[in-house]
Amino acid sequence: MELVRDNWTKNDYDDFVEELRSYADEKYRSFHSSLIPDNDKDFFIGVRMPVMRKLGKEISKGNGRSFLEQTTDNSYEEKTIRGIVIGLLKTESYEEFSMYSDDFVQRIDSWAVCDGFCANLKESKKYKSEFFPHVCEYTKSDNPWIIRAGLVLMLDYYLEDEYIDTVLECCDNAKNPHYYVSMARAWLVATALAKCREQTMRYIKSNS
């Protein structure tokens, strides 16, 4: 079907989901769903990430905003493609960008959706300094998936001298016991050690 559209209707989106299902790989579905225990296997269609990226990029050549108005969270793949389109959206203001970001992080329910969204959110570079306090707020949430989103966004975009001290402070304060928060904290510190060694070593010594 044609994915570069000026306008998306519910019927268009339903047709898109049918096309998405045509890319399903049952063996991959079984394997991938086993890596994401937070969702039932039935939540997965079994579409590989390169295919989803290609579809998301094609949709983004048209009216991505109209597509987002029709999207549902009925499958891992639909949710992931929503995140890809948001990441590719050329927003007109920081307010619009943060609205889409906030909306999506509320929908995160697995490490895969979280990390894929964060990695694809290239538009955040356009609003880097404005977005940083917002990312810090994510790490203060009661929702472990929003905390993880904040930590992974810091890992992806803010491991620089200008931000590293605040990043490490946020990491230290994000003490939610959820497994995937703990893993994100460890991942963040390990990556920070490679990129900002001096500051991160001070942080590690102060917490030893």
What do these predicted ranges mean?
Residues M1-S208:
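Alpha-helical scaffold domains
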